[in-house]
């Protein structure tokens, strides 16, 4: 029995007392690239295994929300608001009782942009737990019983950098709408400059840094990375590469890659494209059922635990509360 499973069992036994005495914290799951398949049964064994383990984790440890990091519907998104994929890839898969009232905050990936992203946004008015108000947006939370606050900036990295073909091109070439890309980047700069929260997170689909199949996203290394350092961002969360990674740069910015919700890829082909010392953890075992990141933010620190869909704890790291600007 690994330590994570033992912890889950212990906390299950102590659940009544934990409800009263647990350390106040904001807790959430970050999972990317979970979007099933376009043919029956419209989900994969890995997606089902992740849904089951997410439900178990939420039931025992709790979660205030789930952060969806894009590629919500493989391989070409959804066609309209009535697309059956909403039901068969999302609602019917993440259906455990423990998940029914947990909100999802959603952003789009490159495969979503091959379909109708506006329909995913509009679905927010139909589903009680699907929250996707606009292509990019800001979330604000307070840790219960404290004055400690958390901001999360949800980006559309596809409109920022351009779409990418997983088979023909590893890098997004250019944004389709340059004006929209500039608008989003300007919005983010202003938001980060004004952010006074104790923790500031940014989330998008494409990675800034990755050692895997797609590698670092040149557009984000050039345009986003300097903003993360300048404005003291705690961490950047993403998917796109189908594995789990944690990287940290010389400025202390954490890079949480959680793209193992539906596929697993062991590739390390871009390991030499990432600066020495950045990579702290990588997991892409082909026979694995995938996994996700579980984040807990307290008044003192932010903890990120990578969990395999089998229930095994793979890696854990901590990031400090940032100094108030």
From Swiss-Prot:
Annotated positions binding Fe cation 2: 71, 110, 205, 240
Compartments where found: Lysosome
GO biological process: bone morphogenesis; bone resorption; defense response to Gram-positive bacterium; negative regulation of inflammatory response; negative regulation of interleukin-1 beta production; negative regulation of interleukin-12 production; negative regulation of macrophage cytokine production; negative regulation of nitric oxide biosynthetic process
Reaction equations catalysed: a phosphate monoester + H2O = an alcohol + phosphate
Record's cofactor remark: Binds 2 iron ions per subunit.
Glycosylation sites: 116, 147
Gene3D superfamilies found in the cross-reference section: 3.60.21.10
Cofactor(s) for this UniProt protein: Fe cation
Oligomeric and partner information: Exists either as monomer or, after proteolytic processing, as a dimer of two chains linked by disulfide bond(s).
Full protein name: Tartrate-resistant acid phosphatase type 5
Gene symbol of the encoding locus: ACP5
């Amino acid at each position: 029995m690994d330590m994570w499973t033992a912890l889950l069992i212990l906390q299950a036994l102590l659940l009544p007392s934990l409800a009263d005495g647990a350390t106040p914290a904001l807790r959430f799951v970050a999972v990317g690239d979970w979007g099933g398949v376009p043919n029956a049964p419209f989900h994969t064994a890995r997606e089902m295994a992740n849904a089951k383990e997410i439900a178990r984790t939420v039931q025992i440890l709790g979660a205030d929300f789930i952060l969806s990091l894009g590629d919500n519907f493989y391989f070409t998104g959804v066609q309209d608001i009535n697309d059956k994929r909403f039901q068969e890839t999302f609602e019917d898969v993440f259906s455990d009782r423990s998940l029914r009232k947990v909100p999802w905050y959603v952003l789009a990936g490159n495969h979503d942009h091959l379909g109708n992203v506006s329909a995913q946004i509009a679905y927010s008015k139909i589903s009680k737990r699907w929250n996707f108000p606009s292509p990019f947006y800001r979330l604000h939370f307070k840790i219960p019983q404290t004055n400690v606050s958390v901001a999360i900036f949800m980006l559309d990295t596809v409109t920022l950098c351009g779409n990418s073909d997983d088979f023909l091109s590893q890098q997004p070439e250019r944004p389709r709408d340059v004006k929209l890309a500039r608008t989003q980047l300007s919005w983010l700069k202003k938001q980060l400059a004004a952010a006074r929260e104790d923790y500031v997170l940014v989330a998008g689909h494409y990675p800034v840094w990755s050692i895997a199949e797609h590698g670092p996203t040149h557009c984000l290394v050039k345009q986003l990375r300097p903003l993360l350092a300048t404005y003291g961002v705690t961490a950047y969360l993403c998917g796109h590469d189908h594995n789990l990674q944690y990287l940290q740069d010389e400025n202390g910015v954490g890079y949480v890659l959680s793209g193992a919700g539906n596929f697993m890829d062991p590739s390390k082909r871009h390991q030499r494209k990432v600066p020495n010392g950045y990579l702290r953890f990588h997991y892409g075992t082909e026979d694995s059922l995938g996994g996700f990141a579980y984040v807990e933010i307290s008044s003192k620190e932010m903890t990120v635990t990578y969990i395999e869909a089998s229930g095994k704890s793979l890696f854990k790291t901590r990031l400090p509360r940032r100094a108030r600007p």
